[in-house]
A protein has these predicted regions:
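Mobile cofactor-carrier "swinging-arm" domains
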Residues: 1-54
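Conserved alpha/beta-hydrolase catalytic His-Asp/Glu region
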Residues: 192-256
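Flexible "cap/lid" loop of the alpha/beta hydrolase fold
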Residues: 156-160, 167-198
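Acidic catalytic loop of the alpha/beta-hydrolase fold
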Residues: 267-272
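Short beta-strand/loop motif that positions the catalytic acidic residue
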Residues: 257, 263-265
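Active-site loop/oxyanion-hole signature of alpha/beta-hydrolase fold enzymes
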Residues: 57, 61, 105-150, 154, ...
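Catalytic histidine-centered segment of alpha/beta-hydrolase-like enzymes
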Residues: 292-305
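Conserved HGGG/HGGXW glycine-rich cap/lid loop of the alpha/beta-hydrolase fold
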Residues: 64, 70-114
Length: 314
């Protein structure tokens, strides 16, 4: 279960409590007690001037504003891309850890989060090109790319079109590696107009459905009600899925001998089956994590973070 403590958009000092994730058997009273004790005893860390104020920034590409958060100041660079219908907060439990020894950018995809909602060409190829141009505008020549779900397909497309920009790929529950995809989930997510309608679809993202609480559903509905969002989601979906299957596969990209690829999957993924990971050639480093679902980077954040850090340092 996820209990938000910080308000959306609130600026907090390093080390402050954003929220609490617990097992479903933990009572509300126990959570309240923990939060109260933490807040009473919390002393903000002293941070250097350059580390203060992690804030949303924007880069403009062909008339589109893409929002991103930058953390870390290492010489090496990583880029995090979320999936369909998500936003950069999908990396809430990952970005700061991954940024301990490098500079890490987490983007809102075009049409998502705080990025421009009306994007013209909504094909994966066009979205991937916009993200590549964004990184080049930020004067990044090469990066370690991390993609979740549709974000993984975008990483594969970028690697296919601009291999010199991709030092490595980490693909988490990635699209683009098989035919099967849960189309009823995608359509239900786009078309749901209330918490009651949306909840059963969002629950498919997690193995622990107690993580799907009222606040999460309200935040998703607020996003979906923004002018232009439903249209852009439908447009992206139409280019992403065809005849009940994924419209494109990029398995040949990960199978190249010179590709550095890490694949992570939740064994209980109900959106993109873990069999896609099992079907990959044996030389690709693959980890299928038991008891976790499609949002494995949130449900098993510590384990996923360690796998990525170890992969980068290998």
């Amino acid at each position: 279960m996820w209990r938000a403590v910080a308000a959306s958009g609130e600026i907090l000092p390093v080390g402050a409590l954003l929220g609490v994730m617990t097992q479903s058997e933990i009572s509300d009273d126990e959570i309240d007690s923990f939060v109260t004790e933490f807040q009473e005893n919390f002393v903000p860390e002293e941070v250097s001037e350059e580390d203060q104020g992690i804030e949303l920034q924007y880069v403009e590409i062909d008339g589109m504003k893409l929002s991103y958060v930058k953390q870390g100041d290492g010489e090496q660079v990583a880029v995090l891309l979320h999936g369909f219908g998500g936003d950069l907060n999908n990396w809430l439990f990952n970005q700061s850890v991954l940024a301990e020894k490098r500079t890490v950018y987490a983007f809102d995809l075009p049409g998502h989060g705080s990025s421009t909602k009306r994007i013209g060409d909504s094909s994966l190829e066009s979205i991937a090109e916009a993200l590549y141009q964004a990184i080049r505008t930020l004067q990044v020549d090469g990066a370690d790319w991390v993609g979740h779900s549709m974000g993984g397909a975008l990483v594969l497309q970028i690697a296919n079109a601009h291999p010199d920009c991709v030092n490595s790929m980490t693909l988490i529950g990635s699209a683009g590696l098989g035919d099967e995809i849960n189309v009823p989930y995608l359509e239900g997510f786009v078309n749901s107009q209330s918490r009651r309608e949306l909840k059963p679809h969002v629950e498919q993202l997690f193995n622990d459905t107690s993580l799907v609480n009222r606040q999460l559903l309200e935040d998703l509905l607020k996003f979906k009600r923004i002018d232009g969002v439903k249209d852009v989601l439908n447009d992206v979906l139409s280019g992403f899925v065809s005849d009940g299957k994924q419209a494109a596969r990029w398995t040949e990209v990960v199978e190249k001998d010179n590709s550095r690829v890490l694949v992570i999957w939740g064994a209980e993924d109900k959106i993109l089956p873990a069999q896609h990971a099992r079907n990959l050639p044996g030389h690709i480093e693959t980890h299928i994590l038991d008891s976790y679902g499609h949002m494995v980077q949130m449900e098993a954040a510590s384990e996923v973070n360690q796998l990525i850090v170890d992969f980068w340092s290998s």
